[in-house]
Amino acid sequence: FFPIGVFCKIFKTC
């Protein structure tokens, strides 16, 4: 799965 940082950038949900 994607790292939390990448997930943040793509889905804009931190």
From Swiss-Prot:
One of its GO terms (cellular component) is extracellular region. Disulfide bonds join 8-14. It comes from the Eukaryota. The keyword Disulfide bond applies. One of its GO terms (biological process) is antibiotic metabolic process. It is found in: Secreted. Expressed by the skin dorsal glands. Keywords: Amphibian defense peptide, Antibiotic, Antimicrobial, Disulfide bond, Secreted. Antibacterial activity against the Gram-negative bacterium E.coli and the Gram-positive bacterium S.aureus. This is Japonicin-1.
